[in-house]
From Swiss-Prot:
Keyword Nuclease: no
Positions bound to [4Fe-4S] cluster 1: 109, 145, 183
Keywords recorded for this protein, A-Z: 4Fe-4S, Iron, Iron-sulfur, Metal-binding, Mitochondrion, S-adenosyl-L-methionine, Transferase, Transit peptide, tRNA processing
Name this protein carries in UniProt: Mitochondrial tRNA methylthiotransferase CDK5RAP1
EC number assigned by the record: 2.8.4.3
The UniProt record lists the keyword S-adenosyl-L-methionine: yes
Length: 601
């Protein structure tokens, strides 16, 4: 019998789920089993007959079709802190951290920040401790990004640095274990294990529940990996552990994966297909965050609730959210796309959509700001725009990734829209949400991009005048459609030159857009001290722009006559006096609440 067949048979018969990759420990056990099979096992005929009888008896005692139908409906999961049963080849105590210290480093997007909190929640329940001191760590985990080559090169360089740390490890301490988590583990699993023997574990974005097992296997001196992508993993029952005791905001993952299959993008291959969390679990997490108490850096003069004041809903394609967990909402209701937009896949039907979720989340706490990222322009039906306009605590800021201003390049990118459709959507959004702040993504030097295509992108930047932007040179990724069907034919120096031009134009136009705020009074959520001045405070306005203002005493509108100093988590009114492409400056007027601020802004 092949060793892998042995593992799979044990797996099925004992009822525990599929392993993404079989550890060397379990393979060794199976090899030992198969090498002794000729003397310890019955003849093949008797074995086959016994297996058939055993299968028949288990089938008769197994669940009925009615049981299957009942279990197929998604349960209302509660956030659980229980440790799952160990696989048969490990004892329960081998899965426990025994107070070993874990050091976590996060690279890349906001989803990775949230993934770090999920991974830490799982490890904490298994008995690990967290440290911010690299030197005292027993386990170092890097949560990685694979969106561009530069992001991966950063990790390779970091591993080279950690190799020296592992080599110098005193023998009196437990061996240092190093793990790669996230998208890079998913994309380059074999290369990482073969190239960097000092890497002990790999865990893809859908395998964080398996971290205790992987670390237990690594304790035997073997490399261990789980990079299986899931069709249903959302970590809905895992309450992420917020990593900062003084944080004013938090990320809440509402869905994972992406179905868009844009030709340049590696995300569908590193994070899998779209699947959404049940709304009930999202609301439970948001409620906990609104009640979560954090300690401000200085005692407030007026004590009150210090729950988190801002939540950002996260997803690779956040506004395509679709909760199909409740059967009564699974009727074939058509999906409304933005006008002039199409999809590259068969449009799904039914379920509770993003507008319903946004409505419910905004009702949890009227004093909590709600943001979301990263959306796709195709999924902005009127009901979403109307809700953003009506609710005071849903930020009037929309990220609208364009990627290019050329319809020809957009078609090659498989974005599902033309330049004209995109511009029409921009106008519609601004009409629906007066004063909305817009941000976008752009790629310079995509496959086949000509100078004329580049000029069209420049003109789009000038036409729209974004408040914020994220601009990058194109980086070819293996497995993508562009890698298989297009040619990366724009020279690197041309990509960089075009990128610099886009950045220059963006800054010019963003400065113009932001200067319209000068003289206006804006509501700012205080985050803390400015990084550049100990006498200034820093916060963000409704449009997610950074606002700097002096740390001075002010009035509290809810406590007339009381003078206070702002602290993280406070809402303050700031009169804007100057603006650049990235920052607003002003002077503080008073401390207020989100609901009361509408009378002043």
């Amino acid at each position: 019998m092949h060793p892998l067949q042995c593992v799979l048979q044990v797996q099925r018969s004992l009822g525990w789920g599929p392993l993404a990759s079989v550890s060397w420990l379990s393979l060794r056990m199976c090899r030992a089993h198969s090498s002794l099979s000729s003397t310890m096992c019955p003849s093949p005929e008797r074995q086959e007959d016994g297996a058939r009888k055993d299968f028949s008896s288990r089938l008769a005692a197994g669940p009925t079709f009615q049981h299957f139908l009942k279990s197929a409906s998604a349960p209302q999961e509660k956030l659980s802190s229980e440790v799952e049963d160990p696989p048969p080849y490990l004892m329960m105590d081998e899965l426990l951290g025994r107070q070993r210290k874990v050091y976590l480093e996060t690279y890349g997007c906001q989803m990775n920040v949230n993934d770090t909190e999920i991974a830490w929640s799982i490890l904490q329940k298994s008995g690990y401790l967290r440290t911010s001191n690299l030197q005292e760590a027993d386990v170092i985990l890097l949560v990685t990004c694979s969106i561009r080559e530069k992001a991966e090169q950063t990790i390779w360089n970091r591993l080279h640095q950690l190799k020296a740390l592992k080599t110098r490890r005193p023998r009196s301490r437990v061996p240092l274990r190093i793990g790669i988590l996230g998208c890079m583990a998913e994309r380059l699993k074999e290369e990482i294990l073969n190239r960097e023997k000092m890497v002990d574990i790999l865990a893809g974005p859908d395998a964080y529940r398996d971290l205790p097992r992987l670390l237990a296997v690594a304790e035997s001196g073997q490399q261990a990996a789980n990079v299986l992508l899931s069709l249903d993993e959302t970590y809905a029952d895992v309450m992420p552990v917020q990593t900062s005791a003084s944080a004013t905001s938090a990320f809440v993952s509402i869905m994972r994966g992406c179905d868009n299959m844009c030709s340049y993008c590696i995300v569908p291959f590193t994070r899998g297909r779209e699947r959404s969390r049940p709304i009930a679990s999202i609301l439970e997490e948001v409620k906990k965050l609104s009640e979560q108490v954090f300690l401000p850096p200085r005692p407030p003069k007026v004590l009150g609730l210090q729950g988190l004041k801002e939540v950002t809903l996260l997803g690779q394609n956040v506004n395509s959210f679709r909760d199909n967990s409740e059967v009564q909402f699974n009727s074939a209701v058509p999906t409304n796309l933005s006008r002039g937009f199409t999809t590259n896949y068969k449009t799904k039907q039914g379920g509770l959509r993003f507008a319903h979720l946004l409505d419910q989340v905004s009702r949890v706490d009227p004093e909590m700001r709600i943001r979301f990222t990263s959306p796709h322009p195709k999924d902005f039906p009127d009901e979403v725009l109307q809700l953003i306009h009506e609710r005071d605590n849903i930020c009037k800021q929309i990220h609208l990734p364009a990627q290019s201003g050329s319809s020809r390049v957009l078609e090659a990118m498989r974005r599902g829209y033309s330049r004209e459709a995109y511009v029409e959507l921009v106008h519609h959004i601004r009409e629906s949400i007066p004063g909305v702040s817009l941000s976008s993504d752009f790629i310079a030097g995509f496959c086949g991009e000509t100078e004329e295509d580049h000029v069209q992108t420049v003109s789009l930047l000038r036409e729209v005048q974004y408040n914020m932007g994220f601009l990058f040179a194109y980086s070819m990724r293996q497995k993508t459609r562009a890698y298989h069907r297009l040619k990366d034919d724009v020279p690197e120096e041309v990509k960089l030159r075009r990128l610099e031009e886009l950045i220059t134009i963006f800054r010019e136009e963003a400065t113009k857009a932001n200067q319209t705020s000068v003289g206006c009074t804006q509501l700012v959520l205080v985050e803390g001290l400015s990084k550049r001045s100990a006498t200034d405070l820093c916060g963000r306005n409704d449009g997610n722009l950074k606002v700097i203002f002096p740390d001075a005493e002010m009035e509290d509108v809810n406590n007339p006559g009381l003078r206070v100093r702002a602290q993280p988590g406070d809402y303050v009114l700031v009169k804007i006096t100057s603006a650049s492409s990235q920052t607003l400056r002003g002077h503080v007027l008073c401390r207020t609440t989100l609901r009361d601020s509408s009378a002043y802004c």
